[in-house]
Amino acid sequence: MKTLLVLNSSGRVTRSLTRRLTSRFAEAWSAVHHDAVVVQRDLTLNPPPTINEPWIVAAFAAPDTPATVREAVLRASDELLDELTAADAVVIGAPVYNFGLPAQLKAYVDQIVRVGRSFALTGDAAVPYRALLAPKPVVVMTAASDGVMLPGGALAHLNLVEPHLTAALGFIGLTDVRFVRVADSVADQAAHPHSLAAAERAIEMILPRLAAA
């Protein structure tokens, strides 16, 4: 039985391109894996808490700190990490908002990049960190206005979503990160259907590779 974790972060609950693509991916995944379990987490409707001082103190607390103290503060982080760890594959809807991640997706990343759970301190100055999560494929559905911030676009260097997710996920062990990109239709209505069709074809190409992995 294969488990797919679907994370949506678009502020648009309707008319969202990334939600459309994550839904399409989940449908195609279920068609390939007939006994699949699809776990849906909407980071917009149920946003993770942001990091604060009690969280930092609990995350870096000494091992002999009472469990009840840590568990109360880190409950949301534990839930998200347990969910991520249990998944065989992950699909993320991540539109480009003001050059970077939607705030709710950034909060999610902050909750899952956690010392002792998803990475360890090695004590070795040459290699100070070690990833703790088992490898699994991650597919990111991303959308940017008119495509100018997608690879090859005039403003691609301003797109911080792809390097941010690649770095953060790779840091905790998820190094197989693939991107499916679609241009929004703010200015070029004619190009939008072609971009969306190309993104849906990309999904069809990725799935067999994941199944064979």
Swiss-Prot record:
InterPro entries: Flavodoxin_fold, Flavoprotein-like_sf, FMN-dep_NADH:Q_OxRdtase_AzoR1, NADH:quinone_OxRdtase_FMN_depd
Cofactor dependence: FMN
Positions annotated to bind FMN: 10
EC number: 1.6.5.-, 1.7.1.17
A molecular function (GO) term: oxidoreductase activity, acting on NAD(P)H, quinone or similar compound as acceptor
SUPFAM superfamilies: Flavoproteins (SSF52218)
Keywords: Flavoprotein, FMN, NAD, Oxidoreductase
Catalytic activity: 2 a quinone + NADH + H(+) = 2 a 1,4-benzosemiquinone + NAD(+); N,N-dimethyl-1,4-phenylenediamine + anthranilate + 2 NAD(+) = 2-(4-dimethylaminophenyl)diazenylbenzoate + 2 NADH + 2 H(+)
Comment on bound cofactor: Binds 1 FMN per subunit.
Pfam families: Flavodoxin_2 (PF02525)
Family: Belongs to the azoreductase type 1 family.
Assembly, per entry: Homodimer.
Function, in words: Quinone reductase that provides resistance to thiol-specific stress caused by electrophilic quinones. Also exhibits azoreductase activity. Catalyzes the reductive cleavage of the azo bond in aromatic azo compounds to the corresponding amines.
Name of the protein: FMN-dependent NADH:quinone oxidoreductase
Species classification: Bacteria, Pseudomonadati, Verrucomicrobiota, Opitutia, Opitutales
